[in-house]
Amino acid sequence: MGDLRLVRGAFLWGMSGIYLCAFLSLYTQIPGLYGREGILPAWRMLRFTGKGFWEQLMDSPTLLWLGPRIGLDTEQGMELICLLGTLLSVGALLFSFLRDSLVFLLLWILYLSVYQVGQVFLYFQWDSLLLEAGFLTILVAPLRALRSKTNVWSPHDGITFWLIRWLLFRLMFASGVVKLTSRCPTWWGLTALTYHYETQCIPTPAAWFAHQLPVWLQKLSVVATYVVEIGIPWLFFLPSQRLRVFSFYSQVLLQVLIIVTGNYNFFNLLTLVLCLSLLDDQNLKSEQKGKKTQQKGQGFSIKSLTVLLDLLAFGLLAFWTVKYFNLQINLENYSVESKTAFTYHDFLQWLRTLTFPSIWLAAASLGWEILYGMYRSASIPGIFWKFWATIQWIIFSFATVGMFTVSLVPYTYIDFESNGQLWPSVHRLFSKVDRYQLVNSYGLFRRMTGVGGRPEVVVEGSYDKQTWTEIEFMYKPGNISAPPPIITPHQPRLDWQMWFAALGDHSQSPWFTSFVHRLLQGNKDVVRLVQNDESLYPFNARPPHYIRAQLFKYWFTENGQTGQTANHWWRRRHVEEFFPTVFIGDATLESMLSQHGLKDKPPPRRSLDAPLPSTLKLIRDFLRPYPAPLLLHSLIIAIIAINSLQALFGGGSKAGSSKQRSHSKPQSDKKKQKGSTAHSDSGASGTGGNAGHSSKRREKS
């Protein structure tokens, strides 16, 4: 790949934005989820047993162990961590000098700290993905103390940035593979999307319209999903810029369509940021510079071979798609018919055959990046800077190879026979770092749930056990006439767990018993998870005496439907009781709370009069009235506006001053600068070099 300075800058900016969304979204939910009287109090995860600080840190790597030393309870420590993470993220979004390796190290440590006590509400694949991507960002980001200029590209940066591409490959390839290895009949029958839009956790209004699309188009969309997730990721590592750009737009299209039709918090945005690893700076430059570059190729050269490789790759991709999904154009119905033309055994055999070749392909790509980094290090002028660049190249090459090696363990979970063939030392190394979430396995939408109707838990409260009132949530489906919300990048973690709870028995979701108990107690923090505007909560005046939960099946209404449901988004049917009628002091409720260990007494509350706890309380009281999506959307819009003004005025003034300086230089100086920049361009210096090289880099930025 070519120069990656601009792409890396965009990636670091994007990761800063993802951290902002993750920290601020979680911050708004801490009191209800993890408070002393929340659904799953966080203090339960940190038992002070008399061990030393470092022993505790090894058992559970989280900064929350320091909470008592600064006068904070566990949930207050979580609030402080999320606020610090939000502030650091905002700073990194606004100021490039904060997009530094040390800053991203702090962000990663902060998110790992809350993850360790997050329990079931933080056990999502995108939380693990953020931790892995966040750790890789530490390696990708510049360490300002080791660089003479903040915007200079180092020889080893292409090596560490390759790890982002490898992570993207593992994420997409595994997500496609597990759909078939799960033996889910809807994925094999190509009918998964006829259920997906109405059965996903929190659909958007666009999902209703997507659900109305004809079945043949839904099946063709599943085929396209397989191509994007299983076939195209192999192009990530081929030596063709055109194939990588094609891969980039394919992945972006899939993620954008998912964002439009579903509320998946920051997950798809994070995937889009990872997709930047498929580009280089040439893709971000103007067409004029691209045209000048294109004119250099003459005759049958490397460029011609690359074109042949591109045509071969596109041809094979199209051929295999048509063959294995039996694509046929139906001119009578103006449709494209499709069906799987291979068996489960065929797919397993293919997967087993190609798992290790995929590793070899990735290793060859990494090897090229390492060799190219060595060449760039050797091309730097000056003995000292050449030696310094070589030392960095060695260190980061070993770090990259180490991360790649460890990641092979979770990657080969897609085929356990391949996983068993890895060296025992690789498994041992993985087990040592597993607690830090450095590498993870992925596989989204393994099975399509909700076939035959979307299961949904409806909570009801009553004062007299005769008249029952439904308790509506802000985001999950409930009221059949309420339109689906648009809340990305916020993740209402209670609503998400309600979706999972509906897929099984309430005993499989112990937190639900605690949730019901808190509603009976009238806990305000838990109520705000249900309705941020307490006036919309039906039991705002006093808590209900009785609570129960019913299981319903929900379906989207059909297009053109008339009658009573014409203006409704949903239709539903009662299935059975999900949770029995309980009340405060009820023996059944007390038994379930004891069974799940939810009756333990919390430690004594710390004083709120100290400066730090009182400051945290002031911030909480100030932000409490505002819904989380409003906070996130407002802050993101403000940051984008500020960045735009910085680019408009700051960039313009820098360009003007640079141009003025270049015109004011004597002719001899210009010749010297031209010669020095040409020399340093051939070596792509990253850590040192002459003044002309640095000047040219600054003008480009």
Question: Where are the regions a protein language model picked out?
Answer:
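Alpha-helical membrane-anchoring segments
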Residues: M1-S701
